[in-house]
């Protein structure tokens, strides 16, 4: 296990704490960040270059040549929207209203499943 993997595992553990503490929007942001990090790691591994400074998960998966099914693509597209730092206030307010326990748990579980699947993509030829 390398430092990056240890860090990603720690983030997954932290996310469950955010859910328990009702920090739902933070939890969803970190779901995005965790998937972004693992995808950027795959980009580096497979292209032997630095990962681009982008945050769109579907684009990172494409660059890393990860074969995703339609459901996975849809989930990554939705989870990308959880990275809202530079968005307009109206967008943020709409997002925050969605961030209840059920919505957050749903996407936490989807993110965890995607993360574990992507983890298996390492060293895959």
Predicted region positions:
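Terminal alpha-helical segments
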Residues: 1-125
């Amino acid at each position: 296990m390398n430092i990056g993997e240890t860090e990603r595992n720690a983030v997954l553990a932290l996310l469950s704490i955010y859910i328990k503490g009702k920090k739902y929007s933070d939890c969803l942001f970190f779901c995005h960040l965790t998937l972004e990090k693992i995808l950027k790691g795959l980009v580096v591994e497979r292209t032997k270059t630095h990962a681009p400074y982008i945050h769109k998960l579907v684009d990172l998966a494409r660059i890393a040549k990860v074969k995703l099914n339609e459901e996975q693509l849809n989930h990554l597209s939705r989870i990308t929207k959880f990275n809202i730092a530079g968005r307009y206030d109206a967008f943020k307010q709409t997002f925050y209203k969605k961030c209840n326990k059920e919505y957050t748990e749903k996407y936490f579980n989807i993110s965890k499943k995607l993360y574990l699947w992507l983890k298996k993509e390492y060293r895959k030829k």
